[in-house]
Design a protein with these regions (language model features):
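Active-site phosphate/ATP/adenylate-binding loop shared across adenylate-forming ligases
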Residues: 3-31, 36-248
Length: 248
């Protein structure tokens, strides 16, 4: 079948993106040095920066001596201050969100998501898709439906009034407009609880769609596919979604 305008346009965009990322990969030391200086310049006036004597122009060795490697518990005193709504603690201003992790090692953890860090989450996903298009010369998946298996996009608030949720649920609010028309499942299905009810709702919404891409934690995707095959009676996923081609 003929490709859509979106599919055709994605190829030159993918070529430009791949060239840019290849250039970045070719100068890792210079780029990391510039990044360190940018981070130092912006963090030196935060509480963490002052507590550790961070200054623009510090060498890598000076930075390593000033900020020893530590686990989450070592950062927790500063994180707790930011969670309560104090500004300029770990990064200038207030975080937009706190990502609450499941805490498999030592209880729940709160990871600040700032306006400066959010583009890293959405940009890396975009670059991965563009790299696939560039390498495979295939952009047909953009013409079909895409499932994003995520945590609930419902957000709560910290004691300091900052939005909080699972990382994938937070990122769900920042999926670019050019993917929204093809995006599944619905907001309502994504918010269902418990997990089994959510999977059932997503299967019902998607089983008759032209799915071409799925993204999510492997165990979640496996759970979805297993339920899909139970409901449809199909022998494999390809029987249900003949045009399915990409798992991110």
């Amino acid at each position: 079948c003929p490709m859509s305008l979106k599919s055709l346009l994605s190829r030159p965009i993918a070529r430009i993106s791949a060239a840019r990322e290849t250039k970045k990969a070719g100068e890792p030391h210079a780029r990391q040095s510039r990044l360190l200086q940018d981070l130092l310049k912006r963090a030196q006036n935060t509480a963490f920066g002052r507590d550790h004597g961070l200054q623009s122009g510090m060498t890598l060795e000076q930075f390593q001596a000033a900020v020893p490697i530590r686990d989450y518990e070592g950062l927790k005193p500063w994180v707790d201050r930011a969670v309560k709504g104090e500004a300029d603690v770990l990064w200038p201003g207030l975080p937009d969100y706190f990502c609450k992790t499941s805490g498999t090692t030592s209880g729940a953890k709160f990871i600040p998501i700032t306006p400066d860090s959010m583009p890293n989450h959405t940009g890396s996903a975009r670059n991965a898709l563009l790299q696939y298009i560039h390498n495979s010369k295939n952009a047909r998946f953009v013409d079909g439906k895409m499932i994003f298996l995520q945590g609930s996009p419902k957000l709560s608030n910290t004691d300091g009034g900052i939005l909080m949720g699972r990382l994938s649920g937070i990122v769900a609010h920042h999926i670019p407009d050019y993917l929204q028309a093809n995006r599944l499942p619905s907001f309502e299905a994504n918010c269902k609880e418990p997990w089994e009810a959510k999977v059932n709702a997503i299967v019902e919404e998607t089983k008759n769609e032209d799915l071409r891409l799925i993204s999510g934690i492997p165990s979640w995707v496996q759970n979805y596919f297993e339920r899909l095959l139970e409901v449809t009676g199909a022998a494999n996923v390809k029987e249900v979604f003949p045009n399915f081609e990409l798992f991110v």
